[in-house]
Amino acid sequence: MDEYTDLEALSRRALCDMAQVRPVLDKIADKWTILILTVICPKPSRFNELKRRLDGITHKALADALKRLERNGLVTRTVLPTQPIGVEYAITPLGHSLREPFEALCSWAAANGNKVEAATLRYDNRGNRR
């Protein structure tokens, strides 16, 4: 089977499964999910450590994202018996199963980020010529 036939079959299957696929993608394909899971994949992390490592994330955005990830079974939240009380977040086996596709996506972004930015600039420089 050639590459285009494979892509056509994948595209047809994705469209047929859209009722199942879209809600899941909505839960994992937001601004911070990939980055949060990438940070906690190697080892569990506390909230402030996550906040320090995720440049630009607000306290509220991180708290909301972690709650959503816990609710969706991708992250566990453990209250630590320390003074003051600490909370640690760890990736679940389900969350860990996203590692390979996320690594592929991050690699693609690193390899093609300049091309995407150049295309954006070309488009923006065209103005409203349509």
Ranges and model annotations:
Residues 1-19, 24, 53, 65, ...:
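Recognition helices and adjacent regulatory flanks at domain boundaries
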Residues 1-8, 39, 51, 59, ...:
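Short amphipathic alpha-helical interaction elements located at domain edges
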Residues 15-61:
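N-terminal helix-turn-helix DNA-binding core of bacterial DNA-binding proteins
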Residues 54, 66, 95, 99-102, ...:
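Short amphipathic alpha-helical/adjacent loop interface patches that line ligand
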